[in-house]
């Protein structure tokens, strides 16, 4: 492993640059640099050589040409193991560059700014940076490329332990990371440019939601033992820039490694529970809520959610949107087996009690952002040979948007109950019917091909749980195609229904509500979930 003798450092994100450069200097490495990076290092007392001085060619064209020079790229691309390369480099006075530390212009931050113009975006497309990164990554056997400041400490430590050298394994891993970095960067540029409206040459073109070519990058978090079933292989990836408060930001505090199904179910539970403002508990099984409740505290919320369907809750995923205390965890572990327990925070006592169930996965995820800020920009669904892309369903109803279509008006408690069951229905697989009262689900009918069957299942679930539906409320994620669903709901003693409307037989459905003395509210918004 030959020692690194010369490094080129040119950074947009300069985190840790000074400390890393100081280590290189102590190891006798000559440092080349440009612009702001050179000034930063020089001001910190690190000897640097400006690239313009090294090449004998000035920086020009407003900084567009700085490192695009044979003395730079020859020094990076030249193979030390080929005599003809070595001879040519000596002939033209090109020295080896053994380490390249480069990250790229902040294109993502630029286009995220309000009123970003096309010119602003174009000027933040890096040219020299990716060229150096790709050159160094291609020649990884002889050159190390560092694109992530988070790698500086490990690289410095390895060099200090090996007389300034890096192993083949390290250089190859850095090369792979570098090519991923430039691929993600170019994909982001492509997405932006192909999203622009037809008036692209105007000063501030409108950015469409869906580019004509869709490029996306993810980072592997873990390989899994298997996928949805044992004969399927699987891995979990996260976004390069994951939304704050999203599942991929989890910190696992205890328990076995998460499985494919654990993650799918945990995501369903987390998305549902964080949609509530009041303290809430959501219990999920096979990506469907089987019990949901809001209450004054986590213990009460859990007891109410669990009471909805104690059978289905077994082996479920349990999520809270508030700090969980020891009393709550004690109640859960006394009641049931669970796969995953999730919350923004746990007390020390809660973690101590959970530790007695060593196989339970305990996940902590910060909830400091509004629901909208914690949502993915896109939801993706693979189909044969293609990809469906849509914006997330984060629509939140305001009471002012709702329309009462029945003769009977609603009590204040019924309004509150309708808003609760409607929010739950949004997270239940279609066709979805949810019964509830007092911030507690009483019955959930999910995933049936006919809406009336989901209605009957919700009624049976409430009956099995000995929950009295008299005076309860019902939500349907889509319109009732016939009055039969309303008739079944009326048989249970339910007094208010919320649904989108939009059926050819809406009037028939409205009339059925009036016949039964049921208050009916329509939303005009559907929440299909497949």
UniProtKB/Swiss-Prot annotation:
Gene Ontology annotations for the cellular component aspect, listed alphabetically: cytosol
Biological process annotations from GO: 'de novo' IMP biosynthetic process
Coiled coil spans: none
Keyword Repeat assigned: no
Pathway participation: Purine metabolism; IMP biosynthesis via de novo pathway; 5-formamido-1-(5-phospho-D-ribosyl)imidazole-4-carboxamide from 5-amino-1-(5-phospho-D-ribosyl)imidazole-4-carboxamide (10-formyl THF route): step 1/1; Purine metabolism; IMP biosynthesis via de novo pathway; IMP from 5-formamido-1-(5-phospho-D-ribosyl)imidazole-4-carboxamide: step 1/1
Domain notes: The IMP cyclohydrolase activity resides in the N-terminal region.
UniProt similarity note: Belongs to the PurH family.
Protein name: Bifunctional purine biosynthesis protein PurH
Organism in which the protein naturally occurs: Neisseria meningitidis serogroup A / serotype 4A (strain DSM 15465 / Z2491)
